[in-house]
Each structure stands twice: as structure tokens, then as C-alpha cells.
Amino acid sequence: VFHQHMGDRRIDADFDTQVFAGFAHRLHENGIEFKDFSPGNVLVVVRENGYEFYLVDLNRMAFREEMSLEKRLKNFERLPPDERLIRIISEEYASLVRKPFDEIYEGIADATRAFRMKFELRRKMKFWKRRKK
């Protein structure tokens, strides 16, 4: 699982993350929006000749003719709120889409922050809703 590899010293986690950014870019270039890039839904297999990525929850995909940059960056919203992880993905993704690093980093960081805020708000609302019963 992707998040398990982030702390695995047997593999180069930075390189693993860069390769993941390339994998996501290839999906986006082909108009594939995987709606749940949460760490548990991305499986990583380390092979002698590189990495293989597999997606879980394939029913959470959308196929589009084209994906705007805004849509692509929002697609990373479920990544863990780990600045180092977001920075590495942003560096690689920026080079692949030929955009400034700051633009990509801010877009992904904003998307992950907004998602976390919505997630926490929903969690709190559920808590208070249960207390009313």
C-alpha cells in the first residue's frame, strides 16, 4: 500500500513518490480521473525493473476527453497531508506538465487542505448528530 512504502527503508521513498506522480500524470493525460488517491487505494509492487502501481476501488473512476490542470491537482486531494510527500509529487508533476513548481505545489496543497477541512467538518457533524439522539 502506498502509505506503507513511505516509511519503508528498503526502498527509495522519494523515488517511489516521483514514480507515483508519473503514474498519476499518465492517467490524467489519458483522461482517467481516479477519484480516490487515498493511500489505501494505491498498491505498489516493487519489481527488479521498477515499480508497478495498482488501483483499488475502480468504480471510483471517471473517463474524460481532457482534464484541466485544476481538475488534475484537485485529484490529489486525498493524499495524506504530508508536506514532504506533496512537495516531491509537486516537483515531479510540475516537470511533467511543464508548469512552475509553486503553481503545482499550491494547487495540490490547497486541495488536500480543503479536503481535510471538509472531512473534519463532516466528522464533527456526525458526532453532534449522534449526541442529539
Predicted features by range, described:
Residues 36, 46, 62-64:
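Activation segment
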Residues 32-39:
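Catalytic-loop of the protein kinase fold
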Residues 1-15:
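Conserved structural core of kinase catalytic domains
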